[in-house]
From Swiss-Prot:
InterPro entries: Ribosomal_bL19, Ribosomal_bL19_CS, Ribosomal_bL19_sf, Translation_prot_SH3-like_sf. It holds the Pfam family Ribosomal_L19. GO terms for cellular component: cytosolic large ribosomal subunit. Gene3D superfamilies: 2.30.30.790. This protein is located at the 30S-50S ribosomal subunit interface and may play a role in the structure and function of the aminoacyl-tRNA binding site. GO terms for biological process: translation. PROSITE patterns: RIBOSOMAL_L19 (PS01015). It comes from the Bacteria. GO terms for molecular function: structural constituent of ribosome. This is Large ribosomal subunit protein bL19. SUPFAM superfamilies: Translation proteins SH3-like domain (SSF50104). Keywords: Ribonucleoprotein, Ribosomal protein. Belongs to the bacterial ribosomal protein bL19 family.
Length: 118
């Protein structure tokens, strides 16, 4: 049992991305996603607030929420996915929770997040 676990662990460590920025819930990020349309491949930017982060090694994921034309859009990204080209932190948010699911119910000024001064 333990031997198989070590083999899987070794394979997963080889798949991990190393050049990822530090970010957490409340931060505003821009994620450049590789999108394939027919034979062409292009980058699509998705900018929004990180409302959740799930740290599970290779299975780590984060959820980004933005308001597009008055409609809330959430997208879950796998942190180490080959489809993610880059992640850029635009703004650090000062929040006191790890999961910001309460932002789903809020709109306008009540959905704003204070900026963290470092």
């Amino acid at each position: 049992m333990s031997g198989k676990n070590l083999i899987i662990q070794g394979i997963e460590e080889a798949q991990l991305k190393s050049e990822l920025p530090e970010f957490s819930a409340g931060d505003t990020v821009t994620v450049q996603v590789k999108v394939k349309e027919g034979t062409r491949e292009r980058l699509q930017a998705f900018q929004g607030v990180v409302i959740a982060r799930r740290n599970r090694g290779l299975n780590s994921a984060f959820t980004v929420r933005k308001i597009s034309h008055g409609v809330g859009v959430e997208r879950v990204f796998q942190l180490h996915s080959p489809l993610i080209d880059s992640i850029e932190v635009n703004r650090r948010g000062d929040v006191s929770r790890a999961k910001l699911y309460y932002l789903r119910d809020r709109s306008g000024k009540s959905a704003r997040i204070k900026e963290k001064i470092r």
